Structures are given as C-alpha cells and as structure tokens.
C-alpha cells in the first residue's frame, strides 16, 4: 500500500475536518517533508484527473479533501432535498435554538422548547448540522452543542454573524406563541 493511498484514506475518513502535515507524519511514522511531497503529488493527481470529483485544499499547513467546484450545483441540490424532507419541526426548532444560543446544553434547549430534545439532537448530529463541543462546567458536566461547518455551508453563510438578526422580543413572542399552541394541542387531545 503506497504512502499516497494511506494519506488519501486518512483524508477521506477525516471528512470536513482539517488534518495537519505533522499529524499525518505521526500517524504514518514518516518525516513531514515526505508527507508534504506526497500531498503535493496527490493534489497534482486530482488536478489532472478529469474523471475525479475530488480536490485537495490546503490552508495554513492543514489539508482536507473536497469536491471540485464544478460539482457544487449538483451537491447543493443533493444536500437540500433529503434534509428538507427529513427534518421535523422539532428538529428545526432545536437547530434554530442551537444556531442562535450556542454553545448550549440539551437541558437548556429543553427549557426553551418545553419538551425533551434528545431525538432532535440525535437527528441533527446524524445530518452533521450540529456537534458536541465540550462540557459545561456545572454539576453533571452536560454536553455543549454547537453548529458545524456543514451547517454554515448548508445555510450559505461563512460565519454565524451572518444569520438574520432576531430581536429578543420577537424570540419571546415566538416562544409564547409556540407555548400557547402546545397548550391548545394538549387541551384538544
């Protein structure tokens, strides 16, 4: 098995996370200069191969595999359809809360929504829209949830600051309306 193939496999399993030359060198027990040369060869291979949809990008000494820009439209369509059809209203509510209040715990999300959010959190993690990001320094050390880079890509933004600004009073009004809808639903059952 070639060094190039090993590096490619590691880049593939790393997914959207960046990997540094130093990390690859440690994993493969090779000198960083050899890893750097292999990465350059791999990058050239992807550039020349017109039948490959992959590309290798580098930022600040870290690398990751991505799809070539010419595939962006088809990938946007693919990524939109299943999530739009599969995310329930509770999952969308949970995602919105995390996007605006992150980092946030499940208990804090539950308090805002008024119901248990475990199922919604699991679905959002499966879609790679959110991830665990450490523990809150309180009794029980609950997980903290944040949105992912994929969430930003999916929303078509580069930074969370680009999310629409929501007035705190508007949020409270929406929460009150949502709470009222739940009471009506409970009374009708």
UniProtKB/Swiss-Prot annotation:
First-listed, main subcellular location of the protein, grouped into a coarse class: cytoplasm
GO aspect biological process, one term: cell division
SUPFAM superfamilies per UniProt: Winged helix' DNA-binding domain
Location in the cell: Cytoplasm
UniProt keyword NADP present: no
InterPro entries documented for this protein: ScpB_csome_segregation (IPR005234), WH-like_DNA-bd_sf (IPR036388), WH_DNA-bd_sf (IPR036390)
Record keywords, A-Z: Cell cycle, Cell division, Chromosome partition, Cytoplasm
Chain segments annotated as transmembrane: none
Gene Ontology cellular component list: cytoplasm
Keyword match Cell inner membrane: no
Family in the record: Belongs to the ScpB family.
Subunit relationships: Homodimer. Homodimerization may be required to stabilize the binding of ScpA to the Smc head domains. Component of a cohesin-like complex composed of ScpA, ScpB and the Smc homodimer, in which ScpA and ScpB bind to the head domain of Smc. The presence of the three proteins is required for the association of the complex with DNA.
Its biological purpose: Participates in chromosomal partition during cell division. May act via the formation of a condensin-like complex containing Smc and ScpA that pull DNA away from mid-cell into both cell halves.
UniProt cross-references to NCBIfam families, sorted A to Z: SMC-Scp complex subunit ScpB
Name recorded for this polypeptide: Segregation and condensation protein B
Organism: Streptococcus mitis
Organism lineage string: Bacteria, Bacillati, Bacillota, Bacilli, Lactobacillales
């Amino acid at each position: 098995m070639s060094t190039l193939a090993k590096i490619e496999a590691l880049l593939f399993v790393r997914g959207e996370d960046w990997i540094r030359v130093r990390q690859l060198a440690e994993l493969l027990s090779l000198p960083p200069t050899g890893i750097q040369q292999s990465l350059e060869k791999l990058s050239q291979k992807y550039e020349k191969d017109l039948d490959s949809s992959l590309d290798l990008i580098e930022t600040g000494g870290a690398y990751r595999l991505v799809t070539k820009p010419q595939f962006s439209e088809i990938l946007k369509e693919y990524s939109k359809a299943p999530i739009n059809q599969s995310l329930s209203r509770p999952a969308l509510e949970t995602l919105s809360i995390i996007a605006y209040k992150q980092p946030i715990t499940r208990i804090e999300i539950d308090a805002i929504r008024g119901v248990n959010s475990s199922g919604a959190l699991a679905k959002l993690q499966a879609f790679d829209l959110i991830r665990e990001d450490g523990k809150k320094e309180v009794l029980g050390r609950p997980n903290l949830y944040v949105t992912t880079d994929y969430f930003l890509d999916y929303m078509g933004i580069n930074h969370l600051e680009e999310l629409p600004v929501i007035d705190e009073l508007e949020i409270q009004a929406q929460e009150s309306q949502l709470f009222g809808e739940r009471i009506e639903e409970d009374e009708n059952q």
